[in-house]
Amino acid sequence: MDENKKRALAAALGQIEKQFGKGSVMRMGDRVVEPVEAIPTGSLMLDIALGIGGLPKGRVVEIYGPESSGKTTLTLQAIAECQKLGGTAAFIDAEHALDPIYAAKLGVNVDDLLLSQPDTGEQALEIADMLVRSGSVDILVVDSVAALTPKAEIEGEMGDQLPGLQARLMSQALRKLTGNIKRSNTLVVFINQLRMKIGVMMPGQSPEVTTGGNALKFYASVRLDIRRIGAIKKGDEIIGNQTKIKVVKNKLAPPFKQVITEILYGEGISREGELIDMGVDAKLVEKAGAWYSYGEERIGQGKDNARGYLRDNPTVAAKLEAELREKFQPSEAAREEGDDEGDDE
């Protein structure tokens, strides 16, 4: 760059700093690029698949899937992990369906959880913005986008047609929220539902679509698709669900990784079940017939007994987890490459 251009640029940068404050514009090389802070999800498999050890702070995350697939369970586990690390959590329950007893079973400290059950979508998003701007909340969950009903719809008649109202509300809210989220380093998780597209479908295109328009797809740094793929049985009794979680979008590490984990009724994600599955894959746990062995010790006949052994022996579980973390060490957060990866359906 010639001297005249350098002087002009320096003058422009000086004027910008004077008008908008120090740090409004900076050279990327002038600051140390630090790894993104993350909040663990409660699932070791998912933390590794996300590439940064959990859900990123200072970002928007969308978790979507069919009904009863484990969306709220996953967010409650993330809240529990955040609270264990001394963080503050807020839950905006637009569906008015949060069960505090179930949340407590998953490890959430319900006494310290900030809960809001707003009347309208505008109220929910305004409360979310105020909590984010306070800078004192580490994780904020909105459950769910589909339940964020615009005020005009609530005040109108039952059959009124108000096309695009919710999409406009979400678009406006996210424009306002994202800057505050980055500044306050808050993780904001939006839970979303699926709907079916009506009309002509292109071959190979999914008929499923998330609610609330397209804005959230663009603003989200991480999008997770969570689905129930089978039942977990103990004899004839169903004790949980086998669940597939796919990282559909990830701006911080390579996307499209997927994990199959277990969600047990009344317990949440089975940490011990994950350790066994990952241990077998990594050849740290040996499976001979129905028996599982770790090191010199047999830990159980059948997965349920092996799971019980690890639950009763937390030191053994911690040792196995440490070995697995060492083997599957998440790589450092890659630099964000924008929205041009073609990762939205």
From Swiss-Prot:
InterPro entries registered for this protein in UniProt: AAA+_ATPase (IPR003593), DNA_recomb/repair_RecA (IPR013765), DNA_recomb/repair_RecA_CS (IPR020584), P-loop_NTPase (IPR027417), RecA-like_C (IPR049261), RecA-like_N (IPR049428), RecA_ATP-bd (IPR020588), RecA_C_sf (IPR023400)
Keyword DNA damage on entry: yes
Keywords: ATP-binding, Cytoplasm, DNA damage, DNA recombination, DNA repair, DNA-binding, Nucleotide-binding, SOS response
Pfam families named in the record: RecA, RecA_C
Signal peptide bounds: none
Residues annotated for ATP binding in this entry: 65-72
Listed GO MF terms: ATP binding; ATP hydrolysis activity; ATP-dependent DNA damage sensor activity; damaged DNA binding; single-stranded DNA binding
GO BP annotation list: DNA recombination; DNA repair; SOS response
Cellular localization per UniProt: Cytoplasm
Functional summary from the UniProt entry: Can catalyze the hydrolysis of ATP in the presence of single-stranded DNA, the ATP-dependent uptake of single-stranded DNA by duplex DNA, and the ATP-dependent hybridization of homologous single-stranded DNAs. It interacts with LexA causing its activation and leading to its autocatalytic cleavage.
Family of the protein in this entry: Belongs to the RecA family.
Record's protein name: Protein RecA
Name of the gene encoding the protein in the UniProt record: recA
